[in-house]
Amino acid sequence: MHAYVYKSQRKQDTFVYLATRDDFSVIPADVQARLAPFAFVLDAALTPERRLAQADADTVRAALASHGFYLQLPKTVVLAGECDYD
């Protein structure tokens, strides 16, 4: 299975994987409104052996097969000073 990876031009560290190149119609309109425009990053073969930096390849393949896209959001890091311990 191939995935076409695009970077959101509006939200840092946010990527969309598509099953079909440039087929943004599979992405819900409200998601597109927040993240578009997108810039093409790479065409990747998602084999069972393939490792991805921020996502599980099996999860991405399943989402592409069922929905036609996978949304990769940035990791959230909570710093100790930002926590409310009360």
From Swiss-Prot:
InterPro entries: YcgL-like_sf (IPR038068), YcgL_dom (IPR027354). Residues 1-83 form the YcgL domain. It comes from the Bacteria. Pfam families: YcgL (PF05166). PANTHER family: PROTEIN YCGL (PTHR38109:SF1). This is YcgL domain-containing protein XCC3997. The lineage of its organism: Bacteria, Pseudomonadati, Pseudomonadota, Gammaproteobacteria, Lysobacterales.
